[in-house]
Amino acid sequence: MKKLNIIYEDKEILVVNKPAKLLTVATDKEEIRTLYHEVREYLHKKNQKVFVVHRLDKDTSGLVLFAKNPRLKEMLQNNWLRYTREYVAVVEGKLPKEKDTLRFYLQEDKTHRVYVSNKGLSSVTEYEVLDTNKTQSLIKVRIKTGRKNQIRASLAYIGNPIVGDKKYEAKINSLSRLGLHANRLVIKHPITNKEMEFLCDAPTQFYLGFEKYKK
């Protein structure tokens, strides 16, 4: 088992930095090679259990929060939309505005691809441009909802797919991975009610791939 990159741990919660290309939880095709399995093995040695609060896409890296009992899991999930969830992303092209809020209804097709529709579930995604190079933009993203592939589908719809995202027709793969990383999470601790901020910078290759294309 690979060593977990633990950002924070106490008696109630655990925050881990998930690497890209690792599932958060099991699927029909893969049950073992998941972050959940690694965390469960780690906590089993301490006679503790683990409960999934949320998940990241397989190709997205960054902060994932786990609870250590079902009551805490429910408390965290009930307040999830109140928490601050921020990402850093590298997208193709220049954004239409330096800062904007994208409000779309999202649906999922039979191939599990999410797309913008007049029906579907409402989503709210905020972005702010941090830097640009000749072909891409580095942006900060904050989500107000928690729809599947929300960031990826919304940015692709406005013509700025995340680099490396073949599922949403990205043509650039400058990072040799999906250009999306969950770098900031602010919650209220379910027991102490204290506000807690967790930070986790993207891997070096994330920024090196972007800088390579600057003038």
Residue ranges and their predicted role:
Residues 1-215:
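RNA pseudouridine synthases
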